[in-house]
């Protein structure tokens, strides 16, 4: 039986259009040279399509296929910081409150370093965190990409690191916890919160001091 027929049978048997199915390794064996699916213009995100992941069988941790050298796309464009935002946080009668983000445009110099277009130092409150709005491109495609790793330094010392690779399947649902949603919904870039959201998995943050909060 092919996948479509098997899924249809399971949906009818369970009387539900929404089903999560788990199959054994021998259900649909794949040999080298077999066609599993087609990508590109044969499908789109507006209809049924496939996402591929490469995971370690024993740990179920993701492999980053580019970092591991499994695929080597042509990529001559470094990731780019577009804006930097600062959000002050506090607690009022036990309820967390956040200020409206203060936003600063960023330019990349010829030396490859970044500078704010804002004159003078950035003013920060008693406690807060930064949000980096970033994007990435790659040769030969029109897509824009997010980033899988961000490291923040204070006085030359790493104080925060976010890594979005090698996590297990069961915490995939938490992957958006690294985004700053109020900024993300109005941006075409990735808005990475440089602080750990309450409830976000610790494994996303191999380096962490004060949950990424900047205190003055």
Regions found by a protein language model. Name each.
Residues 162-216:
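Beta-strand-rich ligand-recognition modules
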Residues 3-28, 53-136, 140-145, 159, ...:
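Acidic, glycine-rich catalytic/binding loops that coordinate metals and/or anionic ligands
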Residues 149-153:
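Beta-strand signatures of extracellular beta-sandwich domains
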Residues 36-43, 137-141:
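Inter-heme linker and motif-flanking segments adjacent to c-type heme-binding CXXCH motifs
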Residues 27-39:
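A structural signal for short beta-strand/turn segments enriched in small hydrophobics and glycine
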Residues 39-53:
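Active-site loop architecture of trypsin-fold serine endopeptidases
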Residues 36-37, 81, 157-159, 216:
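Local beta-strand/beta-hairpin segments that build beta-sheet-rich folds
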């Amino acid at each position: 039986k092919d996948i479509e027929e098997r899924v249809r049978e399971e949906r009818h048997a369970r009387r539900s259009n929404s089903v999560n199915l788990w199959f054994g390794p021998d259900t649909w064996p794949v040999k080298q040279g077999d066609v599993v699916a087609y990508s590109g213009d044969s499908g789109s995100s507006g209809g049924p399509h496939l996402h591929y992941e490469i995971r370690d069988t024993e740990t179920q941790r993701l492999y980053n296929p580019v970092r591991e050298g499994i695929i080597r796309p042509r990529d001559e464009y470094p990731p780019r910081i577009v804006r930097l935002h600062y959000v002050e946080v506090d607690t009022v009668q036990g309820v967390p409150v956040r200020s409206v983000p203060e936003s600063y445009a960023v330019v990349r110099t010829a030396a490859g370093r970044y500078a704010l277009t804002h004159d003078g130092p950035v003013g920060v409150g008693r406690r807060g965190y930064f949000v980096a709005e970033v994007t990435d491109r790659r040769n030969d495609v029109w897509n824009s990409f997010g980033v899988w790793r961000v490291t923040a330094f204070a006085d030359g010392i790493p104080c925060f690191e976010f890594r979005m690779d090698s996590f297990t399947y069961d915490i995939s649902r938490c992957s958006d916890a690294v985004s700053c949603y109020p900024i993300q919904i109005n941006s075409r870039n990735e808005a990475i919160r440089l602080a750990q959201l309450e409830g976000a998995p610790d494994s996303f943050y191999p380096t962490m001091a004060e949950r990424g909060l900047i205190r003055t």
